[in-house]
Amino acid sequence: GGGLLRKFLSFERLIRPDELVDIKRTTNEIEEDFARRPAGGPARPVNLDPGYLALSKVVLATTKDYSHRVYLGKGIYAEVTLHFREGRYEPWEWTYPDYRTEEYGKFFLEVRKCLREALHTRRETPKEEC
């Protein structure tokens, strides 16, 4: 709906893809906690969509099954939302419209640059400007 505020966060600590299940379960608990707040506010005031960025793709976690999603375990599925091709992240036919925008693409390219640096130097955290 209208009036939504969106914010992406990228963390310095690199994760293993198999951590995504527990991360999504934790964000679900956070969403439920916010939903239990006093009445009068939105039914779902916070929507957290964790995922990870790899050099070749952006993966999101979800609790909803669909033909292009892979079951990871504990009720969590993964979706490759974007794939890297010819210098940019490109959408698939199922990619949500907002993930197709130039603004989001720029953000993911910046995060990819930081990830490349972190992987190149074999550190757990990238340079300060990342």
Question: What role is predicted for each listed range?
Answer:
Residues G2-L5, I15-A35, A39-E129:
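Long, contiguous binding/interaction regions
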Residues K7-F11:
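A generic structural motif
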